[in-house]
Amino acid sequence: MDQAKLARMQASVRIGGKGTPRRKVKKVHKSSGTDDKKLQTALKKLNVQPIQAIEEVNMFKSDGNVIHFSAPKVHASVPSNTFAIYGNGEDKELTELVPGILNQLGPDSLASLRKLAESYQSMQKEKGEDGDKKDDDDEDDDDIPELVAGDNFESKTEVE
């Protein structure tokens, strides 16, 4: 680009200095405060009460994983059978939490935990079988000869 043309462009886009309007970068802030306010108003309509001293909440999913909340905020409305649990949830595998949650479970929960463990084991076996199939494919690749540098089939046909 020509230096004179560049200097003219810079002069027309002057930032700062005496008497020039300042250019400001427009920043768009997406506030999560509005979502929190909406949540609080919805909870007030349900007449929920906060429940204190809950250290952790575990939600078991059908695929064998667990949504784990450590130190969540819990609000409950017993008459409407509504519980609000919010905080930072982490998606963890069942095996990570098993030793710590066994003493917290009742007899009915232990039965459901056994079912989850069985489904988890079957999922792991399926993954293992898929891995075995992939290993078998690697064995089939051993039949294919490797290319060697320097060997040229065209030169061999010309010699014969």
Curated annotation (Swiss-Prot):
Keywords: Cytoplasm, Nucleus, Protein transport, Repressor, Transcription, Transcription regulation, Transport
Record Gene3D superfamilies: Nascent polypeptide-associated complex domain
Cross-referenced CDD domains: NAC_BTF3
Cell location: Cytoplasm; Nucleus
One of the GO BP terms on file: protein transport
Biased composition (Acidic residues): 135-145
Chain residue ranges for the region called Disordered: 16-36, 118-160
PROSITE patterns in the cross-refs: NAC_AB
A Pfam family reported for this protein in Swiss-Prot or TrEMBL: NAC
Bias (Basic and acidic residues) ranges: 124-134
Keyword ATP-binding recorded: no
Biased composition (Basic residues): 20-30
Function, as annotated: Component of the nascent polypeptide-associated complex (NAC), a dynamic component of the ribosomal exit tunnel, protecting the emerging polypeptides from interaction with other cytoplasmic proteins to ensure appropriate nascent protein targeting. The NAC complex also promotes mitochondrial protein import by enhancing productive ribosome interactions with the outer mitochondrial membrane and blocks the inappropriate interaction of ribosomes translating non-secretory nascent polypeptides with translocation sites in the membrane of the endoplasmic reticulum.
UniProt similarity note: Belongs to the NAC-beta family.
Record-given protein name: Nascent polypeptide-associated complex subunit beta
Gene behind the chain: EGD1
